[in-house]
Amino acid sequence: LANGDEVDPDGHVLNSLIETVMRLQREFANLKYAFLTVHKARSFGSGSERLYVTNKEVKNFEPLGEICSQAGGRIPSPQLENQNKAFASVLERHNKAAYLVVGDSANFTNWAAGEPNEADGTCVKADTHGSWHSASCDENLLVVCEFYFIL
């Protein structure tokens, strides 16, 4: 078929395939542009390339990793002040605290006065102002996941 032999002597099949590929390339370019536009708009207000989104459920820490992973995200781990502000804005809107993960080599932290205090628990939660507190991993807090897009 590709060489236009007796099965498709006029090359109609090949021409149809070429047209289909070109149409799919245009559609892909349009979808990519739309996606990047929405992402840039969502991150513009927060100044962060990371998006923090809630499903409005409250859960303890145990299922959080799986919930976020299934959604294509991860447990929040703000690495910069603007990321922490974006995370805190979600908490403020819902007037609830949420879990976060603090890496061992974190360059940015936002511990509240007197924190971390392992007597309060081994997990970390952020309040509606974005301050971090030690917490029990059994507390039911707002489910928030972090999504990071490499542009």
UniProtKB/Swiss-Prot annotation:
Its main location: secreted. Residues 31-146 form the C-type lectin domain. GO terms for molecular function: carbohydrate binding; phospholipase A2 inhibitor activity. The keyword Calcium applies. Keywords: Calcium, Disulfide bond, Glycoprotein, Lectin, Phospholipase A2 inhibitor, Secreted, Signal. Glycans are attached at residue 107. It is found in: Secreted. Disulfide bonds join 68-145, 123-137. Expressed by the liver. GO terms for cellular component: extracellular region. Residues 1-4 form the signal peptide. Belongs to the alpha-type phospholipase A2 inhibitor family. Inhibits enzymatic, anticoagulant, edema formation, myotoxicity activities induced by snakes phospholipase A2. Is oligomeric, but it is probable that each of its subunits can bind and inactive a PLA2 molecule. Oligomer. This is Phospholipase A2 inhibitor BjussuMIP. It comes from Bothrops jararacussu.
